[in-house]
């Protein structure tokens, strides 16, 4: 990996981000709308899974270059997008919550091909449910883990407040719970 201090980003992820930010939206571009919403006192949170997470990081970096300071990025199973110089330049300017499922290979996929790219150093590692048979990168696994964490925290908070919390007895379901794949239909104008 080159250590010359020049910021480098993955060309494919950068092209995708450029295309997204240049897309028309309400008489402006998506980038202009996001930039207008990203200035203090507002906080702008960008999030994504896999490629969407890579784009969220690069979009936040571009918005930071335009003066936005209230940026938060939450990625789920995102690949590395830049080199060490990129990470040093933006690591303090955007609040990044990098979430990775234990065993998710996408986190290190880009580094396996090129040593130019590095992940931001901090990350939160989630464990899949013990009964899951999903591929570690599957978005449904991330959604399941997020919901489990939410309800665990909610239950702890309700208990702390002294509220009655229904006890499920810790019994496993008679059959596994199936989460259907997420899908959406986009308007053809998009």
Identify what each model region corresponds to:
Residues 2-47, 57, 61-190:
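Serine hydrolase/lipase
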């Amino acid at each position: 990996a080159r250590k010359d201090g020049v910021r480098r980003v993955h060309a494919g992820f950068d092209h995708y981000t450029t295309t997204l930010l240049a897309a028309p939206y309400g008489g402006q571009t998506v980038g202009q709308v996001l930039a207008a919403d990203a200035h203090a006192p507002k906080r702008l949170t960008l999030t994504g899974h896999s490629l969407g997470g890579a784009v969220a990081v690069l979009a936040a970096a571009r918005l930071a270059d335009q003066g936005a300071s209230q940026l938060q990025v939450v990625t789920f199973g995102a690949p590395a997008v830049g080199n060490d110089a990129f990470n040093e330049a933006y690591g303090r300017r955007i609040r990044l919550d990098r979430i990775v499922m234990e065993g998710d290979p996408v986190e290190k996929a880009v580094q396996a091909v090129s040593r130019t790219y590095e992940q931001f150093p901090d990350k939160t590692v989630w464990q899949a449910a013990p009964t899951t048979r999903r591929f570690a990168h599957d978005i449904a696994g991330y959604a399941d883990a997020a919901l489990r964490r939410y309800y665990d925290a909610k239950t702890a908070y309700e208990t702390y407040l002294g509220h009655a919390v229904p006890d499920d007895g810790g019994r496993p379901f008679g059959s596994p719970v199936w989460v259907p794949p997420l899908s959406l239909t986009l308007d053809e104008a998009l």
